[in-house]
């Protein structure tokens, strides 16, 4: 990685404004999944050990520029203190005289959590005045929020105009793993693209067709490709305005020598529920009033075989409606194939794929689970991420 990280700068006694991603799911004031807090711990611990004064900034939810009581970061700061085994202070604002006083009172190794940065309208507008206020608190800016790296906001990008800017350890790892996958992958390199909509994955499919040996398609977006082959798809999801594009992608794969895999059989249903009756049919036999909700058993076997024989697999998007038990088997099978594959480096591209491997208890069998859904998708589209571009080069 050609960006400076916290390993490249002197931190002792320095005030560090560290942007983390503490956007954790909450229910009635309780954190229901603390993965993101845990993901930031190595960076925070490193800063503490190096004798920095650690000022942590994050967003939580979408308060849209105003104070929303249940989106305060107070429970997060409390949990962070427990995980670090030390006293963590919490500010009621994210900048201003009261916060400056708290920062002035900090000793080396102290940790302070600022209030939700999205309580301020200027955050999402990347307002220069707000960025200056953030910068006034610190000597160095550290961006460790890969999950928000695709946003040009005041605390993820704007602040870098006024302070030296480096990556945290989590950001560094994300950029290394995803960067290597795209620039110098081990082969055979397989991408598995699922999810509901073709339109969300156009950029990533187009970019990956230049890089991969195998492209596997699943999820709701597969039915647009099935229809592009001339098959009836019943009530399955379809984007009619993307059928020509699907044809173009299949043609491109052929021209570039990419093995293009799509379902040969699917699980279909007449009702969308936990107790739904399902049938398994060939891809050319979906009845008119049924809809496809998962990949079938033959498809699972084919996909598992491709995975097993790959050196690198990048997975973005589930194979079916995995949140419902009757439609979860395809996604589970892909996860299992990745878990069982020996000598295969597996990169899970955040979002729903990450949620699926967590749900099925396979997370610890994956080589790398990205902490950024949207960010990893944009990175895999070959886009520059504002939260990365703003960091100082080595």
From Swiss-Prot:
Keyword Kinase: yes
Annotated binding of ATP, by residue: 201, 292, 323, 350-353
One Pfam family per UniProt: PGK
Keywords from the UniProt entry: ATP-binding, Cytoplasm, Glycolysis, Kinase, Nucleotide-binding, Phosphoprotein, Transferase
Enzyme class: transferase
Localization per record: Cytoplasm
Pathway: Carbohydrate degradation; glycolysis; pyruvate from D-glyceraldehyde 3-phosphate: step 2/5
Record: residues binding substrate: 21-23, 36, 59-62, 118, 151
GO cellular component, one term: cytosol
Phosphothreonine: residues bearing it: 299
Signal peptide: none
InterPro entries xref list: Phosphoglycerate_kinase, Phosphoglycerate_kinase_CS, Phosphoglycerate_kinase_N, Phosphoglycerate_kinase_sf
Gene3D superfamilies referenced in this protein's UniProt entry, alphabetically: Phosphoglycerate kinase, N-terminal domain (3.40.50.1260)
GO molecular function annotations of the record: ADP binding; ATP binding; phosphoglycerate kinase activity
Reaction catalysed by this enzyme: (2R)-3-phosphoglycerate + ATP = (2R)-3-phospho-glyceroyl phosphate + ADP
EC numbers: 2.7.2.3
GO term, biological process aspect, one: glycolytic process
Residue list for modification Phosphoserine: 183
SUBUNIT field: Monomer.
Family statement drawn from the similarity comment of this UniProt entry: Belongs to the phosphoglycerate kinase family.
HAMAP family listed in its UniProt record: Phosphoglyc_kinase
Protein's recorded name: Phosphoglycerate kinase
Organism of this sequence: Bacillus cereus (strain ZK / E33L)
